[in-house]
Amino acid sequence: MKHLIPIIIGLLALVGFADSVYLTLAHFRVIDPITLESSGVCSLTVGSCMKVILSPKATVAGIPHAVLGAAYFAVLLGAATIRMMIGRWFAPFEMFAFLLAGFAFSAYLTQELVLRMHAPCPFCLTAHAINAFVLALYAISIQP
């Protein structure tokens, strides 16, 4: 089972990366936010996708959260690939710290989405859920 975990983490990282890139494109209006809002996924929570993407809280120091997510998931994909190539996690402590920091940021953003903005954006919550699963899988994979 442990040899499958890096593959699963890599696949989850790909999904998270695609999700974050999609949200980045919507943030920069390469994808029309109206099109995003009318998608089947965003129509489940009327108005939440637009509210989140257009919110001034959707950035940190001018960098959209989705861009940070894309970079985060790209690093995860690279780490999973290296793990599959060399048979062990490269810098396991640093990787755990990186994942823990990402999880903490995701927990904060989820709290903001649900409790403060009252906008449970399905695309955002998907990235946050993936983050939690990856942390759990990584913790399992580093056990002796």
Q: For each of these PLM feature ranges, what is it?
A:
Residues K2-P144:
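Membrane-interfacial helix-loop segments of redox and metal-homeostasis proteins
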